[in-house]
Amino acid sequence: DIVLTQSPASLAVSLGQRATISCRASKSVSTSGYSYMHWYQQKPGQPPKLLIYLASNLESGVPARFSGSGSGTDFTLNIHPVEEEDAATYYCQHSRELPRTFGGGTKLEIK
């Protein structure tokens, strides 16, 4: 199985500043010009919401302050400027092969 390691496990960011979350895969999740990495946001009592698919594509309806980048084994989610409603736990997930594993999550607090 591909192991996804997120860092940091938690972070606190001031309103209006930048939040950066990293995800490292134990082997490449990129092939044929695509990077099969996705980012989700989850708030308590709610299902995960897809933010970014295929490393850098913004899901419809997601604010442009969310952006994703990376390829191969190293990926980043950026949120800028952070808003109060962004307080949540963020997860990376790959779909390069089965099982489609998730990272351990990053809890974002807004100061």
From Swiss-Prot:
What SMART domains does the database record attribute to this sequence?
A: IG, IGv
* Region annotated Complementarity-determining-2, chain positions: 54-60
The organism's taxonomic lineage, starting at the top? Eukaryota, Metazoa, Chordata, Craniata, Vertebrata
Instruction: Please give the residue ranges the record annotates as the region Framework-1.
Output: 1-23
Matching entries from PANTHER family are given as: IMMUNOGLOBULIN LIGHT CHAIN (PTHR23267)
Q: Which residue ranges are recorded for the region named Framework-3? A: 61-92
Gene3D superfamilies noted in UniProt: Immunoglobulins (2.60.40.10)
Q: What is this protein called?
A: Ig kappa chain V-III region PC 6684
The answer to whether the entry has keyword Disulfide bond is yes
Region feature Complementarity-determining-1, mapped onto this chain: 24-38
Q: Pull one GO CC term from this UniProt entry.
A: immunoglobulin complex
Q: Where is this region: Framework-4?
A: 102-111
